[in-house]
């Protein structure tokens, strides 16, 4: 079940990062606390799809032979967007592409630096190499054509070459783009044989070339620019446009939605800023981010070389994003975005302890929180988790359902805290009294013994996936277990926090 997988991945990577503690069913106290209010829809997804498709088609028709469309964010599962814009569907961008799929070709960019350091996509817990393979399979399964993979900032190191060889063995075309000294400011060198000219020319066969990546900082824009240089040399009139949800250009610079984007990219040191080119030409304030503003002179010079005149007056003009016009409840989006910023703060604290980010990233998020008068407790589940820990004297966890109900669980002998939390949540959703166990000790203990005595694990406590497997087996004879499983989809949109020691 897709919903189950997404929720479990969210729990494992964003709530407690695998360093989870245990809760024993027999010792669970009632954990249902109803808060005022519920999750409000803030975004009209149908309107967004309509507006976005119309705008992309308009941009495609603006250019001649080919359009390079840089896709920012995540195509299949943009959960950041769905968290800060409740009502936004994670696969909206994919649905957009499918409306023009006969004209679309996918190129996936991945940075050699990310391959070398084994960078992880934190929301689903896999490295960028695996994410590239997952994207290829997902695109092809959806009916989209994947033309190639571009390794940007290529370095001749074993781990990078091994990945390239793996792709080649799978029949996937791979191209190399190199580090260009002085990029992005030395325009004369960049637009020369010693710049983009030394990059491989990616051979494409469709009118719309979508350039995407496993995550930010992968070199999507540079890949597009390099291709424009090569297409021009080959006599092909190619254009460029950018499809990125955040920052939302027609919202305020300090809108919580845009600040949440800065929090999400704190490790990249991205900064939202007023687009000076747009302000100078149109006299209007719009929001973009530093990398787009910095690269605009390069783009403008390239377009001037190709067409004699640049078709864009500003970085904002390059974009096609219509998300800002589909926000239906700004108050709800503000609340969701503020909660997301605090969630990113806790996530970054754990990443820092595990050596996977920098102190600067955490300090940046602290400053962003201060700018909106937020603190560590400006998220409902934080208060509930802390109160549970104070009441029980042990590691605790809290989960907020979409209707505002707070579910809690604590550490104990046979179950990890998230495992017990899931069972508590399912019992609440199914209307099962708290004192009725979904899984008996007779079911849990044999699994625990198997882990310790046969598989050699030191921790006897059941993980979430093990508990759900046991629950599924129990459902064949236990109607309550079957009822609980039927409620799994209602965990979509849940917010969780675990207070544990690392």
Region locations from a protein language model:
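Short beta-strand-centered segment that lines the nucleotide-binding/catalytic pocket of NTP-utilizing
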Residues: 235-249
């Amino acid at each position: 079940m897709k919903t189950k997988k997404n929720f479990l991945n969210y729990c494992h990577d964003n709530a407690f990062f695998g360093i989870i503690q245990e809760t024993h069913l027999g010792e669970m106290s009632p954990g249902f606390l109803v808060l005022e209010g519920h999750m409000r829809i803030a975004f009209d997804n149908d309107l967004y799809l309509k507006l976005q498709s119309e705008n992309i088609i308009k941009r495609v028709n603006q250019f001649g032979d080919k359009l390079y469309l840089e896709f920012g964010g995540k195509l299949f599962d943009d959960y950041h967007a769905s968290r800060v814009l409740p009502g936004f569907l994670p696969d909206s961008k994919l649905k957009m592409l499918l409306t023009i799929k006969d004209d679309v070709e996918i190129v996936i960019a991945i940075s050699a630096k990310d391959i070398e350091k084994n960078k992880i996509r934190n929301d689903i817990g896999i490295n960028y190499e695996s994410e590239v393979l997952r994207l290829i399979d997902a695109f092809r399964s959806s009916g989209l054509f994947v033309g190639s993979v571009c390794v940007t900032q290529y370095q001749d190191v074993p781990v990078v070459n091994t990945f390239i060889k793996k792709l080649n063995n799978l029949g996937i075309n791979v191209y190399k783009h190199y580090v260009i000294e002085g990029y992005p400011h030395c325009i004369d060198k960049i637009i020369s044989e010693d710049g983009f000219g030394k990059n491989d020319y990616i051979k494409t066969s469709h009118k719309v070339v979508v350039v995407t990546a496993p995550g930010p900082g992968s070199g999507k824009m540079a890949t597009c620019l390099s291709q424009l240089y090569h297409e021009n040399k080959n006599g092909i009139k190619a254009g460029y446009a950018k499809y990125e949800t955040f920052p939302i250009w027609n919202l305020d610079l300090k809108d919580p939605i845009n600040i949440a984007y800065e929090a999400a990219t704190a490790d990249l040191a991205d900064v939202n800023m007023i687009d000076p080119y747009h302000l100078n030409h149109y006299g209007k304030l719009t929001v973009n981010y530093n990398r787009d503003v910095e690269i605009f002179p390069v783009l403008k010079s390239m377009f001037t070389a190709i067409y004699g005149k640049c078709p864009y007056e500003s970085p904002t003009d390059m974009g096609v994003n219509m998300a800002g016009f589909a926000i239906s409840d700004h108050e709800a989006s503000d609340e969701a975005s503020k909660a997301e910023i605090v969630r990113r703060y806790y996530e970054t604290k754990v990443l820092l302890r595990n050596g996977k980010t920098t102190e600067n990233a955490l300090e940046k998020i602290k400053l962003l929180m201060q700018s909106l008068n937020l603190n560590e407790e400006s998220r409902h589940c934080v208060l509930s988790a802390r109160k549970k820990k104070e009441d029980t004297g042990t590691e605790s966890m809290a989960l907020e359902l979409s209707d505002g109900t707070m579910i809690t669980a604590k550490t104990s002998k046979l179950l990890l805290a998230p495992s017990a939390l899931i069972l508590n949540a399912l019992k609440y959703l199914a209307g099962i009294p708290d004192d009725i166990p979904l899984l008996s000790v007779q079911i849990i203990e044999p699994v625990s013994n198997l882990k310790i005595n046969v598989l050699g694990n030191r921790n006897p406590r059941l993980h979430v996936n093990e508990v759900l497997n046991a629950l599924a087996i129990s459902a064949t004879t236990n109607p309550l277990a079957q009822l609980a499983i039927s409620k799994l989809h209602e965990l979509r949109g849940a917010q969780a926090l675990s207070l544990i020691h690392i």
